[in-house]
Amino acid sequence: MATIKDVARLAGVSTTTVSHVINKTRFVAETTQEKVMKAVDELNYAPSAVARSLKCNSTRTIGMLVTQSTNLFFSEVIDGVESYCYRQGYTLILCNTGGIYEKQRDYIRMLAEKRVDGILVMCSDLTEELKEMLDRHSDIPKVVMDWGPESSQADKIIDNSEEGGYIATKYLIDNGHTDIACLSGHFEKAACQERIAGYRRAMAEANLAVNEDWVLEGNFECDTAVLAADNITAMEKRPTAVFCFNDTMALGLMSRLQQNGLKVPDDISVIGYDNIELAEYFSPPLTTIHQPKRRVGKNAFEILLERIKDKEHEKRVFEMQPEIVVRNTVKKLN
């Protein structure tokens, strides 16, 4: 494996000059730069990240802890984070925990051992023990994204789920719907509790009673949406609209309802949450609550960089504002 001395020898310059060319730390004449880079290419030289990290006290590596990277919402946020990491010369280590306690614990330990410069956390079900573990690594800058836990050591970006739930339900009410169901994720999750609270607030403002049999529990995946669609189809009195707490469930619900002979939106209206890319191209295109996923990723990374530069900065909370994207799955009844 080639060393910096080999590059310097081939280029006919000092190792210091090679270092300045590679790290862009000082002006070097263009002809000299060309000689150095030609030698780098010929020798297939790669600087030692370990040596650089020891010298600079930085690995230029970010760890990202996520509940489920295959979830379409998460994958779009991850795409935003990765894009901005790449532009800034950082490597992203993605840790997909699957919501498993042991994996969350072990990944946090592993990221600490790898001396990452910072950690992004996007987990909906961190326990108190895990929150304490994050706090124990107080020397590592952290930003918590989406509906993760509060931490005394981390900046936080919140998605304002209560307001999003309110906006979705109010839109249905404004279009004449009074019999409105909601398909939640697991009831114990903070985001679901907030979206249900927003749903109830909009119903209460309109003096509409909530049918508790229509507050359905899912898991943010298609399988429970299919079960919910079968349940709704079999109801003697059906809701005229369903507010789904993410687009994945909304699309699964729509597909099954239409298999069961119910047309969306002619027979039943559906509104989703997240505005994943697929929502626009489904048939019919899904009306949904937009969350700026790539902007969340960008903001999280930028905030983390600020935290890396100023570790003593007091904890901050940044709030994202949800907004409705109107397409073709809500029927106007008034």
Swiss-Prot record:
Annotated positions binding hypoxanthine: 73, 189, 220, 274
A Gene Ontology molecular function term of the record: transcription cis-regulatory region binding
GO terms under biological process: negative regulation of DNA-templated transcription; purine nucleotide biosynthetic process
Keyword entries, A-Z: DNA-binding, Purine biosynthesis, Repressor, Transcription, Transcription regulation
Residue ranges: DNA binding: 4-23, 48-56
UniProt entry tagged with the keyword Repressor: yes
Limits of the HTH lacI-type domain: 2-56
A Pfam family: Peripla_BP_3
Annotated metabolic or biological route of this protein: Purine metabolism; purine nucleotide biosynthesis [regulation]
Keyword DNA-binding in annotation: yes
This protein's domain notes: Consists of two structural and functional domains: an N-terminal DNA-binding domain, approximately the first 60 residues, and a larger C-terminal domain, approximately 280 residues, which imparts the function of corepressor binding and oligomerization.
Record-linked PANTHER family: HTH-TYPE TRANSCRIPTIONAL REPRESSOR PURR-RELATED, LACI-RELATED TRANSCRIPTIONAL REPRESSOR
Role summary: Is the main repressor of the genes involved in the de novo synthesis of purine nucleotides, regulating purB, purC, purEK, purF, purHD, purL, purMN and guaBA expression. PurR is allosterically activated to bind its cognate DNA by binding the purine corepressors, hypoxanthine or guanine, thereby effecting transcription repression.
Assembly information from the UniProt record: Homodimer.
Record protein name field: HTH-type transcriptional repressor PurR
Source organism phylogeny: Bacteria, Pseudomonadati, Pseudomonadota, Gammaproteobacteria, Vibrionales
